[in-house]
């Protein structure tokens, strides 16, 4: 190790090119991994944020929340289970616009009858449980579109006005930003088109473990990962993006392997001298491996550091998310 480090220290020009290459390759792979995770999270981030809860849906929905329809009798059946910390959820696509302004924004409304039991990453210390009727918590990506706390937005389907009271981080679902509203607000919005509408959740979320044996044949229960996998487009998108990352990682490793091989060929005469003075082939091999290890650790550390340093400067609208476990595997 000492000999390997001394050679690097006293002949840095010999190793500078390969070190730069390692840094660039590491930065590229880490950055692509972050984009891959980010693109995956814009499909399922809010479901992931809710944590390890269970979702009770109608069986014909096949695990897709917006496709679920719970009848009054099924809701009564669920109530009879006396589940702990249960929350009703409705997911609805829509568009909205700022009051007195033109142009519309796509949005996915998450309407719930209570916000006490689920995690929402509201900013500035806002407590989601305090959300009142005709108020809305928007995903932070809307900040870049000129929307601020205190603004009023109008749902274009119902013309209902909603006051923005907070922003939330990682509030994404199905390639769309999420807006959180109360069940009463959704009821008012839908009654504009259907006066007879009353609140009827698509899914019941509970922290209590529920099995299929606890439910009738018309109902099903899914965990967090099962719900995520059933979000339209998630599985295919995630598989393609992960494959791209691994292809780049393997290609980078192959390129670096070629450079290290060329570096070893350039040192054949040096190896001969070392053998002549009594150094074994095993010792020479350990020196080379130590050198590769030192160069790799330095390059990986710099590349990872650059990627992490860039994170705070990326626009909120860019889907970028780094995970420690992915960084460890790539490194």
Residue spans for each PLM region:
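N-terminal Sec/SRP start-transfer signal
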Residues: 1-29, 231
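Short helix-to-coil transition segments within interhelical loops
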Residues: 8, 274-282
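Alpha-helical transmembrane segments
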Residues: 14, 27-54
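Alpha-helical transmembrane segments of integral membrane proteins
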Residues: 18-28, 241-258, 295-299, 303, ...
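Membrane-proximal extracellular/periplasmic loop immediately following the first transmembrane helix
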Residues: 45-96, 106-111
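Basic-flanked hydrophobic alpha-helices used for secretion and membrane insertion
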Residues: 69, 94-98, 102-129, 134-232
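Peri-transmembrane interface segments
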Residues: 213-256, 260-269, 273-274, 285-289, ...
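Short helix-loop junctions at transmembrane helix boundaries
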Residues: 286-287, 293-331
């Amino acid at each position: 190790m000492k000999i390997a480090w001394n050679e690097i220290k006293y002949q840095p020009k010999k190793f500078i090119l390969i070190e730069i290459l390692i840094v660039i390759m590491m930065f590229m792979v880490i950055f692509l991994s972050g984009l891959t995770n980010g693109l995956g999270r814009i499909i399922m981030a809010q479901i992931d944020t809710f944590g390890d809860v269970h979702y009770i849906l109608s069986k014909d929905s096949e695990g897709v929340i917006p496709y679920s329809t719970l009848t009054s009798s099924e809701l009564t059946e669920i109530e009879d289970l006396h589940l702990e910390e249960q929350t009703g959820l409705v997911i609805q696509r829509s568009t909205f616009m700022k009051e007195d302004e033109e142009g519309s924004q796509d949005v996915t409304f998450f309407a719930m009858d209570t916000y006490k039991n689920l995690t929402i990453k509201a900013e500035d210390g806002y407590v989601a449980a305090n959300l009142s009727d005709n108020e809305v918590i928007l995903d932070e990506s809307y900040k870049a579109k000129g929307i601020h706390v205190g603004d009023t937005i109008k749902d274009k389907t119902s013309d209902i006005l909603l006051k923005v009271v907070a922003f939330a981080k990682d509030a994404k679902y199905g390639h769309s930003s999420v807006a959180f509203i109360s069940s009463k607000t959704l009821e008012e919005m839908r009654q504009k088109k259907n006066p007879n509408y009353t609140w009827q959740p698509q899914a019941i979320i509970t922290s209590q473990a529920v099995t299929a044996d606890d439910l009738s044949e018309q109902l099903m229960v899914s965990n967090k990962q099962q719900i995520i996998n059933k979000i339209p487009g998630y599985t295919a998108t995630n598989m393609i993006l992960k494959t791209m990352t691994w292809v780049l990682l393997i290609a980078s490793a192959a390129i670096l392997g070629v450079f290290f091989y060329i570096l070893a060929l350039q040192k054949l005469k040096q190896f001969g001298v070392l053998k002549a003075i009594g150094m074994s082939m095993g010792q020479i091999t350990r020196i080379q491996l130590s050198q590769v290890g030192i160069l790799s650790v330095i390059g990986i550390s710099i590349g990872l550091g650059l990627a992490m340093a860039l994170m705070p400067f990326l626009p909120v609208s860019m889907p970028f998310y780094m995970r420690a476990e992915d960084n460890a595997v790539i490194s």
